[in-house]
Amino acid sequence: MPSTYAHRRFGADVLALLPDGLRATLEQHRELYDIGLHGPDLMFYYKALQSNPVNRLGNTMHEQKGEVFFTRARTVVENAPDKDAALAYALGFVCHFALDSTCHPYVEAYVRESGVGHCEIETEFDNALMREDGLDPIKFFTASHIKPSRERAEVIAPFYEGVTVDETLAAMKGMITVHHLLQAANPIKRWVVLTGRRVAGKYEFMHGLVANPQPNPKCVQSSQKLEELYKTAVPLAVRLIEEYAENKPLGAEYQHTFGEN
């Protein structure tokens, strides 16, 4: 997954390019669209420090072809009490898929080439984008657009087989909590956070999500390439969103997973 800021920024860039009517519908349900931008990553944050069926679902979904989720999502939208609300979440998810499927093949290849971890490569890209946008990666709270509520959890939960409304709400709240924990501007807090994650067996994952005080030189090349891929994914996402909103058949793009293949 390109990390939190990249998906957030990407979703805003794509939204600005959509036809007026569709954009207006999504703006009415912007919070759901914004949560959808993080795709199955949302489930990672359910009781994040312990492995469980809900957060493992996030990993499982990343390895599935896009058609698996988006075929199910169509049925969920059709049966939803508020179809526009459900569609807004699904179209945010399309954005996530477009960026992931475009970037992940390169990220995995660069992991093998450089030895830098997957999460660190993506977090370094996040940080590069924030610096480009005049933001401080150490201080900017990247999950400020996530607005947990039971009403939104009721819309989102049906998209995930076997996941309850309570679990979905807990995952949303967990996303906020984890990002607060990882916003380690103070060097002492940073040490405490990373040491605690090492004890919990989550060091590699969490270390990659904590912003480095200085850019990692090994990630300069990857950040430049990922920005190129990001730009190519924008028109792809616009097209896929328009097609999905018009209920057109899923194209060949959905044969790709959210991951490398």
Tell me what each language-model feature is.
Residues 1-90, 94-261:
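N-terminal leader/auxiliary helical segments
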